[in-house]
Amino acid sequence: MDAKKLKILAVDDDMINLKLLKSMLMKSPNVSAIVEAKNGADAIGILKSQDDIDIILLDILMPVMGGIEMLKVIRADDSLRQLPVIVLTTDETKKGEALECGANGFLMKPIREKDVLSKIAQLTI
């Protein structure tokens, strides 16, 4: 039986980072689609309107609503709390806070393709 193809929500305010992440993810045969959001508020709107997101890749430092705040909203919402979230950041000091707020994984930027694909596989199988 074939593995389910994943629909990933990538949240980052840096369009270059989003483009690089999308390029890495689309190389995987297990990814069907990548939905992009530029901040946590936009991402929450997407999650409320699309119930088929399988995993979230989330930057921490963003305007409007940052990653930690978005994590808190997700984990407080019965319809969203089960979604796996991988936090992506350049600030290693945010790891403890992110995990405490419900992140399922943590990767340091710059992201390596094999690391992000491995972490996604761990959390979605």
Model-derived features with residue positions:
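Short amphipathic alpha-helix used as the core "switch/output" element in two-component signaling
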Residues: 45, 68-81
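Active-site beta3 strand of CheY-like receiver
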Residues: 51-57
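Receiver (REC) domain active-site loop signature in two-component systems and cognate sites
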Residues: 62
